[in-house]
């Protein structure tokens, strides 16, 4: 499954390679580790939820259920976005940089690590609205502060888009726009759950 973005590009003279003698084993181990992290994320969140649940009030328990459901959902939406959208864009960008006289043969271990890193980062970035909700309920952040910081957030998202995506304006915007939408969703959630 993780090789599908490369297969879809239908590259000529392309093959992944294992340079070190331990690379085949390490590739499978890293795939297993990252796959386990992605699949176990709901369980990790559930364990945190179970630890906190007995010590809070009934109203807070309702918030906690809401946070749990949305946290898991947003994580998987982020992972899907990273895998189906951002990973193919970044691979096609790197492939475009290759000279015709060069055979594109990246190390399999490097490709697997890069792919899973990108997918996990997207999943974690999609936790922004949940983080806004938690920090609002803990009275660390408030709706007004998030609203005031909107212009700074836009700049930060554009910079992150430039760093994490290929250096063309379209890819930068394709990463920055979802981040901005998540930020606005965080502001909206913070507004709904603000202290009245």
Outline where the language-model segments fall.
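Membrane topogenic/interface segments and analogous intrinsically disordered interaction regions
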Residues: 1-196
